[in-house]
Design a protein with these regions (language model features):
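Sequence termini and other peripheral, non-core segments
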Residues: 1-43, 47-112, 116-232
Length: 232
């Protein structure tokens, strides 16, 4: 979970996303925006049910908390499947999954993550992330000549959560190892890209490699020290 604030302009930051992140971060940004809606406007509902295994001989208690928004109805969807046990015998299992009828967006996830907290801290933060999400969707379409399925949530996200605080853009959350952090959040994320993402970072045309990235990766005399172990 992260928000790659590679520039203070969210659309420029989106253009700086490498191909892997253009594909991956669309869903992550949608999850963060969805979590903002559910944590601020949703009503916590606890669903409890039993999964049934071993032809009815074993019952496993399950519990899930959802945050339905107005217009959504929580329910448990059950599915019966036939499986083969270790001895080769067939048996039925009944598995329940907590879901929402009339779902408007993704479920709440990682709500205590620094980026999730930042996204719902002020309406300015929320709308900045909406623009980053929109920018990455545009990058995806530009680079791969097709639309991402998550684009269906674009219109929903245009309206901020009803209960979000009004306020200015706050400093970006820095979800990265301390070795990349400096006083400037954007430079911190650029450090993170150069030091941790260079091994897989590429940009499919018509996108271009950011100059700050290519210059620093190619400059052997850079003051920035890359870590000895590259993190995935």
């Amino acid at each position: 979970m992260n928000i790659f604030a590679l520039d203070r302009d969210p659309y420029v930051a989106a253009s700086f996303h490498c191909d892997k992140h253009v594909v991956k971060m669309i869903c992550e940004y949608a999850q963060l925006l969805s979590t903002a809606h559910r944590q601020l406007d949703g009503t916590p509902v606890i669903l409890e049910w039993e999964n049934i295994e071993d032809n009815g001989n074993t019952k496993i208690a399950k519990r899930k908390t959802l945050h339905p928004l107005p217009g959504e109805t929580p329910y448990v969807e059950f599915e019966t499947v036939t499986v083969r046990d270790d001895e080769g015998h067939l048996r039925d299992e009944v598995t329940g999954t907590a879901s929402l009828l009339g779902r408007l967006c993704y479920n709440s996830t990682h709500h205590n993550h620094p980026c999730a907290i930042w996204a719902r801290q002020t309406d300015a933060n929320y709308h900045w992330l909406v623009q980053l999400f929109d920018g990455v969707l545009r990058e995806y379409e530009k680079r791969y000549q097709k639309k991402h399925a998550t684009e269906k949530l674009r219109e929903f996200f245009l309206i901020a959560p009803k209960n979000i605080d009004k306020g200015v853009l706050t400093p970006f959350a820095l979800a990265m190892p301390d070795e990349y952090k400096v006083d400037d959040e954007v430079l911190s994320y650029q450090n993170y890209y150069v030091g941790d993402k260079a091994r897989f970072a590429k940009w499919t045309e018509p996108a271009t490699v950011p100059k700050w990235f290519s210059n620093r990766v190619q400059d052997d005399e850079s003051n920035f020290q890359r870590p000895s172990r590259v993190r995935g």
